[in-house]
């Protein structure tokens, strides 16, 4: 799937960007326009990861390490695996990725290797593996403790939602502090806390909502079951949309914006039905 998206980007999207002067698409593929052959080779081996095309490589790499994680969990237990994952995540918060890039002298700029920090995001993946295989059954075996944790998670989620909308995107912080606590690319501490709080909230209220709104939620259930294909269709739609947008700062509004949104939604629902 990733190779198909790369093919779309490096052929049709690149041709339209060059032929019809589409800066948004050209800037997305800047490294490819500067060095076509190295960019193609580097992208195939998941080193060069242009914006929008840097999420599937992350997914591929995390899937690749899953057998190793599961084997380590069976051999040493989940506590040690989670501890190692947490230490790697903590090191990522203090620049592990950039330090390794400098030490290895890689022939590609760090900003061309994708926005998402693998060393940070692996914690979410490993945590999900633990939760699905061991964590959730363990919590369900202790319903009193689980109930208390879920109510605490719901309160925390409400507080963080209020903080986000009262403090705004800057969060009452200077840029350096905000980078450490709220950065999305390195899955910063408050991001981890927020994900845990939302997960607990959904566990608390999700079953009741699903039972009452099952018919309304059915389309989203279908999207979730075909999430990989839905995401692929979404990315392809975005790449093609960049061929329509004339510049980075031009917004589609009015009829053009509605048409683009309708086409995007249609693409993901068609993909989920295939």
Residue map of PLM features:
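Alpha-helical transmembrane segments and their immediate juxtamembrane cytosolic regions
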Residues: 1-274
């Amino acid at each position: 799937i990733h190779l198909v998206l790369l093919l779309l980007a490096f052929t049709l999207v690149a041709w339209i960007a060059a032929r019809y002067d589409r800066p948004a698409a050209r800037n997305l593929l800047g490294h490819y326009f500067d060095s076509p052959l190295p960019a193609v080779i580097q992208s195939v081996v998941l080193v060069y990861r242009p914006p929008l095309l840097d999420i599937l490589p992350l997914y591929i790499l995390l899937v690749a390490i899953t057998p190793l994680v599961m084997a380590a969990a069976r051999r040493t237990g989940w506590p040690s695996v989670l501890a190692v994952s947490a230490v790697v995540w903590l090191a990522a918060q203090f620049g592990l990725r950039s330090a390794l890039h400098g030490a290895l002298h890689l022939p590609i700029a760090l900003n061309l290797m994708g926005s998402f920090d693998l060393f940070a995001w692996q914690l979410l993946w490993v945590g999900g593996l633990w939760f699905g295989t061991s964590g959730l059954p363990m919590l369900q075996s202790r319903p009193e403790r689980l109930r208390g944790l879920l109510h605490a998670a719901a309160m925390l989620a409400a507080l963080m939602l209020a903080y986000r909308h009262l403090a705004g995107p800057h969060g009452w912080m200077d840029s350096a502090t905000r980078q450490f606590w709220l950065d999305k690319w390195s899955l910063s501490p408050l991001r981890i806390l927020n994900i845990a709080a939302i997960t607990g909230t959904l566990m608390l209220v999700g079953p009741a909502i699903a039972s009452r709104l099952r018919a309304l939620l059915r389309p989203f259930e279908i999207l979730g079951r075909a999430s990989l294909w839905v995401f692929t269709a979404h990315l392809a739609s975005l790449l093609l949309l960049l061929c329509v947008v004339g510049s980075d700062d031009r917004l589609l509004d009015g009829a053009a914006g509605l048409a683009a949104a309708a086409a995007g939604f249609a693409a993901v629902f068609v993909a989920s039905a295939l």
